[in-house]
Amino acid sequence: MACENRFFINMEELRNIFASSCVEAVARKVGCSTGEIYRRMKRVGLIAGFILPGYEVLHTQSREHVTEDVLGALLIWERKMGIMA
């Protein structure tokens, strides 16, 4: 009976939830809106090029470590593209 009310999330949904949590954590760390961080990440391709492909490794790390990694990658990718945050 307990299983009747359960729902299942596929891997794509899990990765998207994880990416969303990364956006939120970075926004909280730098003190700006999630919308602004999402736009910055999207502009440099960080979600599709770093967070989603790195899910298998990243999701096993601490929230602090993931946040630092993602923020560091964002700053490096912006710098490489000549974008000033």
Model-identified regions with their sequence ranges:
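Membrane-interacting alpha-helical segments
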Residues: 1-7
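Long, compositionally biased
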Residues: 54-85
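N-terminal acidic leader/helix
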Residues: 7-36
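Amphipathic alpha-helical interface segments used for dimerization/assembly
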Residues: 27-30, 41, 74
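Amphipathic, hydrophobic secondary-structure cores in small proteins
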Residues: 35-58
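Amphipathic alpha-helical interaction segments
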Residues: 29-33, 48, 77, 81
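Alpha-helix initiation and N-capping motif
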Residues: 34, 44, 63-67
